[in-house]
């Protein structure tokens, strides 16, 4: 696939209607569209529709496992949380972690607008690295992390024990638009992102690592049994 063809395909997928006119998903899709508008207004980086559909598919695929929990580490809690809940079974919950109270408020309102019960969301207004160590190990099917490059390795190490076997860590924008491959780049952010990718290679047979051309480059780390 040429670069032009890929861009055209991605644009087409992102242009598909994100809102169903009727059916059980209609209120969720409408809430996602509203949350995306709010994120843009506040200058937050939210995953595009293509990435969001992958998140929904990942949580839907985990619906038969013993764990139906997910964690969102991102300022765009409303958008990410809704996509995660969209694919979850009714007992599934999303733990939203971000220090900004306004981001937490937006997520609560978005979940309510989508028709989700208050118990479906757990809200921790804290820095991720301050609370992840206190969360139950092997209890989450998916962790979505949009963090600064300098925090990537610490977040990887903190979230890895939380995943159930078969669970996936989604590292959004972790490839920095492929600048990690440019060895001439020595700035702190690029060096940290590159080091995080090198660290993942040490996981060996404990994980399956996948890279997807979503956003600035997304890395999926799936824990094996």
Region spans (language model):
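A short alpha-helical cap/connector motif
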Residues: 1-142, 147-164, 168, 174-225
